[in-house]
Amino acid sequence: MNPLSALFGAGVATRNAMFDRSLLKQQRLRGPVVSVGNLCVGGTGKTPFTQLLGDLLMQREIDFDVLSRGYGRESTEIKIVELDGSPNEFGDEPLLLAKYFAAKKPENPPRVIVGADRYEAGRFAEQKFGPRLHLLDDGFQHRGLARDFDIVLLAPDDADQVLLPVGRLREPLTALKRAHAVVATDEVKIEAFPVMPPLVWRVERDIALPEQLSRNARVLAFCAIARPHRFFTDLRRHGLEPVAELTFRDHHRYSAADIEKIVREISSSRADCCVTTIKDMMNLGELVHRLAPIYAVRLSLKLRDADAALDEIIKIIERRQG
């Protein structure tokens, strides 16, 4: 193992051991907590899965909120995400979630609360809205907040990764022993992992292309996500062959200089239009009009045996309430 990864791993192991032995304390909220997280840095579909889980909960008329750190935002204070806010204020993914749930349930949408201290964010939510189910965004390594159910999303290459800072792993693969369920596409080979929780939920991954986007268009595709190659592959799978591709770092907030770079690429590649992700459209902000025509692609997940999976979570809720 690389010395830097070994040093990082030693720190992670020490911290986990302190939680396991109760030398570091977990704080518990009044409402049950379901964590949605991963082993690697970014790119496993946590936001689409949280949307999917939210849809299932709303179908069962279960009240919930989402607690998120709000990665990349300018403040650390606790805030309820407002639909007319910006990624700089709330973080791109919390804002995306808030808008998604508001569109699904306009009359009384699930709230998304951001805060660096997610226990305090949860307390704030309970004081404001009463105890309810909390979905903890990116929570697997956030062990300071006690949870009742840990869901970990896996990517196809997770089993081949090494620890940070050389690789993408936040902690060793054996950390999966803490999880209650993993979520994976059929590409993920479960037997490649040294340990596995009892529940393995399979999902089907797909993208939704705008109807007005012609498959014959000369498309410039760009994105700022953790695994851009998956986005470009998805486009090709749906019959779109980009004439040019541009990538930016995950959660990137686009500047005027970035737009000029994209415009130059449009000209040199003779592209008819741009295609990007829903998250990138949000991070483009008011600059988006300079790239017209531009189309946004939404990633979606479909959970097989969704009712059975949700029943497992409901058992946890009922256990806490009983």
Curated annotation (Swiss-Prot):
EC number(s) for this protein?
A: 2.7.1.130
**Key word Transferase present:** yes
Q: What metabolic or biological pathway is this protein involved in?
A: Glycolipid biosynthesis; lipid IV(A) biosynthesis; lipid IV(A) from (3R)-3-hydroxytetradecanoyl-[acyl-carrier-protein] and UDP-N-acetyl-alpha-D-glucosamine: step 6/6
Keywords, in A-Z order: ATP-binding, Kinase, Lipid A biosynthesis, Lipid biosynthesis, Lipid metabolism, Nucleotide-binding, Transferase
Highest taxon of the lineage: Bacteria
Its lineage reads:
Bacteria, Pseudomonadati, Acidobacteriota, Terriglobia, Terriglobales
Q: What class of enzyme is it?
A: transferase
Among the Pfam families in the record, one is: LpxK
GO annotation terms (biological process):
lipid A biosynthetic process; lipopolysaccharide core region biosynthetic process
Extract one GO molecular function annotation from the record: tetraacyldisaccharide 4'-kinase activity
Q: Which reaction does it catalyse?
A: a lipid A disaccharide + ATP = a lipid IVA + ADP + H(+)
What name appears for this protein in its UniProt entry?
Tetraacyldisaccharide 4'-kinase
One GO cellular component this record assigns the protein to is: plasma membrane
HAMAP family registered for this protein in UniProt: LpxK
Provide the binding site for ATP: 40-47
Keyword Lipid biosynthesis belongs to the record: yes
The free-text function statement in the UniProt record for this protein reads: Transfers the gamma-phosphate of ATP to the 4'-position of a tetraacyldisaccharide 1-phosphate intermediate (termed DS-1-P) to form tetraacyldisaccharide 1,4'-bis-phosphate (lipid IVA).
Q: Which family does it belong to?
A: Belongs to the LpxK family.
